[in-house]
Amino acid sequence: MVNETEALPCEGGCGLYGTRVNNNLCSLCYKKSVLQHSPALRFEPETEQSQCCPPTNSPAVEEEPVKKRRCGICKRKVGMLGFKCRCGHMFCGSHRYPEEHSCPFDYKQSGRLALATQLPLIRADKLQRF
């Protein structure tokens, strides 16, 4: 007598092995046969939601292509080692310094603004003379 777990050729003809538990079908053919015979297991979207809320014809959102990360001066691929400058561009290791790529960002002014916001202005009261 044949065990229930003994592998037999699939009756679906797919070339795989089936079991008696699955009516001599492999797992793939068994899943297909179960879905064909019982419509309750099939996934169908609910019609109530689609009737109450009409579908809107919104324009398809196009995914923007991934920008390749290249140096702003020599156009060499920088990958993960790219350096983003305060001027907003990406640079390689040799062009990352502001002097190398003629950076238009004003570092002195940004430093002055940072100090002005961080340090309070301290003034002594005016001295009165007799």
From Swiss-Prot:
Keywords, comma-separated and alphabetical: Metal-binding, Zinc, Zinc-finger
Domain of life per record: Eukaryota
GO biological process, one term: cellular response to cold
One Pfam family hit: zf-A20
Gene Ontology CC: cytoplasm; nucleus
AN1-type ZnF: 65-111
GO molecular function, one term: DNA binding
Residues annotated to bind Zn(2+) 2: 71, 74, 92, 95
Binding site for Zn(2+) 3: 85, 87, 101, 103
InterPro entries: AN1-like_Znf, AN1_A20_ZnFinger, Znf_A20, Znf_AN1
ZnF segments: A20-type: 4-38
Function as written in the Swiss-Prot or TrEMBL entry: May be involved in environmental stress response.
Name of the featured protein: Zinc finger A20 and AN1 domain-containing stress-associated protein 10
Biological source species: Arabidopsis thaliana
